[in-house]
Structure formats: structure tokens, C-alpha cells
Amino acid sequence: MTTAYYCMGGGLGHITRFTAFCRYFTLRPALLTNCELVRSGMIEPDARPIMLPDEADSIDFDSFRTWVGSAIERIRPEALIVDAFPGGILGELCDLPALKHIECIYLARILDLQAYRLRLSGTLPEFTKIYRIEQLGNEQNQWLKTMRAPVEDLMLPYPSASAHGKSENTELPDNCWLIVHSGNADELEQLWQFARQTAEIEGQTPTFAMVSQGSRPEFLPANIAHYSRYPADELIAQCTRLFSAAGFNIMQQMKDSSNKHHVLPMPRALDDQFLRCRLANQR
């Protein structure tokens, strides 16, 4: 069966979840994404073909929706996996003619539901199955019921955060506090200050290190190691403590190692990291 995976969102989280989903189901689907790190070749997902909209395709909603429909018609999948946003990131999948006769499956993670529903105009795809891949809030659980598809809880596989493995390329020093984030420089600096202040409050003198995509942040002191690496699993397994935002993937990966995970939720347009953090603390 020809399968396509639809993950528009731009951030690394969608591609990381794509990798985890394909690992679990042993899939190598077609991929529709707008991730810039995939476009640049810095990340090479195990997918064929990989289809990315260009600048002209993304100039406005109608152009983007036209590209999406054409891309799906070129792939002609029998099944479409829709990541995170059931109507697409802008609502482009609502009433999309190209989805007729295609089995649509939705991967449901936490949404800022009030913000997301403002983007929807029309009818969502007719899903045949919904995978609920994390604990959701009550409002979103009720919304899933309106989609009239069977809901199955699914825990995607992530590398252990407590494997104590050593990387072939990098070995972190003892008592290393690692900051991992794929967001912008302002958010990275917030996490750096969070880690530094935690050490001061506790009277600790750890060795710090940071993982982020791209060049070394200007604010980072010269004696702090910086790694532009994806994925960072081997470093996460070595660190004594991890400092991050509350994105879906890192929270899933650290679920069984929450004692070493320090979380600073960040505002997002369509995600609710604060809700995710609250639900995690209730477990």
C-alpha cells in the first residue's frame, strides 16, 4: 500500500515525530513537509519521494492549497498520515478534493485548540483512525469524538534518555548539564539562564553544554561546549541533567527520566506546552 505522511509545520518536532512513527510501523512513506532543514539537506528523512513547497507555492493560502492537492495527486497514496493538525496547518486539508478515496489517519497531539480552530473553514478530512499519541486536555478529547473515528492510544518509541551510552564522536564530562533546543536565540538564552540559575540556587558547579541547530549562540560563554547535532540522543543519554522546553518529542523521550529533566514551557502558535507540562506533572 502506498502511504504518504503529511507534516507541515516547519519545526524539527514534526520530522522527529515522523521518524518515530516510521520506526514503530516500519514504514518508508512519501513525505510532504515544509521543514527548512530538510530543504537544505541538513536532515535527510528516510522517505521517498520527499515533496516540499517552494516560495511561490507558499505565497498565499490558495497557492499553498493548490500545491498540496497537486502533490497528493502526483503521489496517489492509498493512505495519508496527517501529523498534528487534522485540517492542515492553515486549514488547507478541509474539503480538499484530492483526499477523496484516500484513507486518512490522524496523529493527535496537544493543540492550542482555540487558536487552531480559527484556521479551519470547511469540513475536516474523513479519518478512518485516530492515534492519540499523548495525553490530551478534556476539550481536545471531546473534539476528537466529533471526528467519528476510532481512537487508539499510541506511545511512539524514542531512544532511552538514561542509557548511559557513550557517543563514538563525543563523550560528555561527568556531571554535565545539557541544554537542548531547536528554537530561536531568545529561547536558547532563556534556557541557558534557567540552567545557570538552577545551578546557583542549588550551589552546584556542573559542566554545561548546549545542543542547538546552526551556529554557536553569541550569548554562550566561550567555555561552554556547543553542538549543532540532530538527533542529540547520545548526548541526552550521557548528561546528568537536561534542560529543554516542553515540546512533544522531548517530553515523550524524557518521560521515564523525569528526575533529570528540567522543563521551561514556551509559547507556541498552535501547541500548548504549558498544558503538556501540567499534565506531565499530574502523572
Q: Over which residues does each language-model region extend?
A:
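Nucleotide-activated sugar donor-binding and catalytic core shared by glycosyltransferases
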Residues: 1-209, 214-283
